[in-house]
């Protein structure tokens, strides 16, 4: 775990220690709190002697996301008790169910746009973010959002849920893309650890086909038009890195039949035994699917990826979102 993350956790533990000490003085039977206070002191001591974050059995590093969830963790996954392993499995299954409820409805049309997405976690939970958010009813605009949170596992899935809540709250204010992303960046930066960030690609589309796209350090969205394919490169850094970051926006006009394809690096950085899938292959598939409906577009990519992998396992979350102007 990098030093900035440990410094942030140390600050949390010191604050927790002060609050526990105050509470212990105020209650009559503080035995449980004293035990917790001892655990906090032990964690701070491990930070001082350089053993914090190392499993007390095998001395290998404890998974970062688990330390971020519980800074008092002493054992890696391989050395949890049977009871702890079962509890972890139950927590993961519950987290997966909750995450699935946050996904938008699929294979739908909304205000002149058709969309379809593919959402495939590498494990039970995902750090990918996929959403379709309506602005106020009068404006007839939709936000199509895809993102990839740093890290993996439960910690990343919790940050994905955080993004979901932020954007659903901010969308009700009827902001343009620029202001939306800047506010989201500031909120995300102020409410998470300094090591947390998320790439994002956000499309604001209106009924007439006008779109605004902001790419915050994400894989380049593709505008798939009849005679050309346009890559929308990054117009800013991932959100959460710097609280005062600025983000550029590109504007386009799409005609009926034009599409936008968004994806996470689970596609472009997928590997078989010999090579990476790569952005060039993403572009090559796009050339072949210009006239496809959104569901067919996604199927073309999943089929091509399966063929490319040739039995190799996927190692990262995979999300793809296709949008088409009707």
Question: Positions of the model-derived regions?
Answer:
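Interaction interfaces in information-processing and related assembly proteins
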Residues: 1-49
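Short, cysteine/histidine-rich loop/knuckle motifs that typically chelate Zn2+
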Residues: 56-58, 78
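Short Cys/His-rich "knuckle" micro-motifs
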Residues: 65-71, 85-88
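Regulatory cytosolic signal-relay segments
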Residues: 77-128, 220
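PP2C/PPM family metal-dependent serine/threonine protein phosphatase catalytic domain
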Residues: 111-126, 181-191, 219-250, 279, ...
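Acidic loop->beta-strand submotif enriched in PP2C/PPM serine/threonine phosphatases
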Residues: 124-127, 133-134, 198, 232-274, ...
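Catalytic core of PPM/PP2C metal-dependent serine/threonine phosphatase domains
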Residues: 154-233, 247, 299, 309-310, ...
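Active-site-proximal, acidic helix/loop segment immediately C-terminal to a metal-coordinating Asp/Glu
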Residues: 155-173, 254, 259-312
């Amino acid at each position: 775990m990098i030093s900035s993350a440990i410094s942030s956790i140390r600050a949390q533990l010191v604050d927790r220690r002060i609050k526990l000490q105050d509470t212990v003085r105020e209650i009559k039977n503080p035995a449980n709190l004293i035990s917790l206070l001892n655990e906090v002191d032990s964690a701070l001591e491990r930070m001082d002697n350089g053993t914090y974050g190392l499993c007390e059995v095998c001395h290998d590093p404890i998974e970062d996301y688990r330390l971020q969830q519980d800074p008092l963790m002493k054992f890696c996954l391989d050395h949890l008790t049977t009871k702890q392993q079962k509890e972890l499995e139950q927590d993961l299954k519950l987290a997966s169910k909750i995450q699935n409820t946050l996904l938008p409805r699929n294979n739908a049309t909304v205000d002149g746009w058709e969309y379809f997405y593919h959402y495939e976690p590498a494990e039970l939970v995902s750090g990918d973010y996929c959403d379709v958010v309506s602005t106020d009813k009068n404006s007839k605009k939709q936000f199509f959002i895809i993102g990839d949170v740093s890290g993996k596992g439960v910690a990343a899935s919790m940050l994905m849920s955080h993004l979901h809540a932020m954007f659903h709250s901010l969308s009700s204010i009827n902001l343009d893309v620029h202001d939306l992303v800047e506010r989201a960046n500031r909120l995300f930066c102020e409410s998470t650890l300094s090591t947390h960030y998320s790439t994002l690609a956000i499309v604001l589309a209106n009924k007439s086909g006008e779109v605004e796209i902001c790419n915050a350090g994400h894989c380049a969205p593709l505008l798939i038009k009849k005679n050309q394919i346009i890559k929308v490169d990054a117009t800013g850094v991932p959100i959460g890195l710097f609280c005062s970051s600025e983000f550029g926006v590109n504007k386009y006009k799409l005609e009926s039949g034009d599409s936008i394809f968004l994806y996470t690096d689970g596609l472009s950085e997928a590997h078989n035994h010999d090579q990476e899938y790569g952005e060039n292959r993403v572009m090559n598939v796009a050339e072949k699917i210009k006239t496809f409906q959104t569901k067919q577009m996604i199927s073309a990519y999943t089929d091509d990826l399966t063929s490319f992998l040739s039995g190799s396992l996927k190692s990262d979350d995979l999300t793809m979102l296709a949008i088409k102007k009707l």
